[in-house]
Amino acid sequence: MKSKVLQRFVLCITASLLFWNLNIATHASTLTPCENSAQFQARLNNNIKKLENKLTYYKQNSQEYTSIKQQIEKTKIRFDKYAKSSLLCGEDGLPHLITDGDWQHSGEFFIPSVLFIYIAGWIGWAGKGYLQYSKTLTKPNENEIIIDLPRALKYMFSGFAWPILALKEFKNGSLLASNDEITTSPR
C-alpha cells in the first residue's frame, strides 16, 4: 500500500515538472548579477574597510586582532560565494531572492522552504505521536512534563517518513477528528 501511494506521489511530481513552463517570468530590470553590481562591490569594500579600521585598536597577533582578521577572510569568502552564485543584486547591493518559479533560482527559496516544511512536519509528527502515547498512560500530564526520552526518541526517529504516514492516516480516516469530537462554543 505504501508503494502505491509513493508511486502516485512520484508520478504527480514528474507530471507537474514535465508540463511546467520553466520560462515563467523575466527578472526585474533593476536586478543584476551580484558579480556585475557596483553597489555589491562597494558594500564588500565598505565591510572590509570597517573591519580593517577595527584592527587599528588592537595589538598585532592579539586574540582580538586575529579574530577580526578571520572575520575579514570570512567576509571575503561570503561575498565571493554570492558573486559566483546565480544570485541577483538590487540597487542597494544586497542579494535578492527570486521566488517566481524559475528553476534556476530554486536553491534560493524553493529548496530551503520545502526543507523547512519537511523538518517542521517531522517535529510535529513526532510530537503528535508522543502526545498520543502520553494520553494512554495513567498520568499523562506527568509524562508530558518529564519526558520519557527513549520513547520520545523512538517517535523522533520514526517521524522521518511523516508525509507517507500522514497520507496513510488520511486514507484510513484516522488523521482527522470526526465532527462529533470537535466542540463548538454556543453563539
UniProtKB/Swiss-Prot annotation:
Alphabetical list of InterPro entries matching this protein: PSI_PsaF, PSI_PsaF_sf
Keyword set, alphabetical order: Chloroplast, Membrane, Photosynthesis, Photosystem I, Plastid, Signal, Thylakoid, Transmembrane, Transmembrane helix
SUPFAM superfamilies listed in its UniProt record: Subunit III of photosystem I reaction centre, PsaF
Keyword Transport: no
Organism classification: Eukaryota, Rhodophyta, Bangiophyceae, Cyanidiales, Cyanidiaceae
Function of the molecule: Probably participates in efficiency of electron transfer from plastocyanin to P700 (or cytochrome c553 in algae and cyanobacteria). This plastocyanin-docking protein contributes to the specific association of plastocyanin to PSI.
First and last residue of the signal peptide: 1-28
One Gene Ontology term, aspect cellular component: photosystem I reaction center
GO BP: photosynthesis
Membrane topology type: Single-pass membrane protein
Cysteine pairs bridged by disulfides in the record: none
Protein name per its UniProtKB record: Photosystem I reaction center subunit III
Location(s) in or outside the cell: Plastid, Chloroplast thylakoid membrane
Residue intervals passing through the bilayer: 107-127
Principal subcellular localization: plastid
Family: Belongs to the PsaF family.
Gene name of this polypeptide: psaF
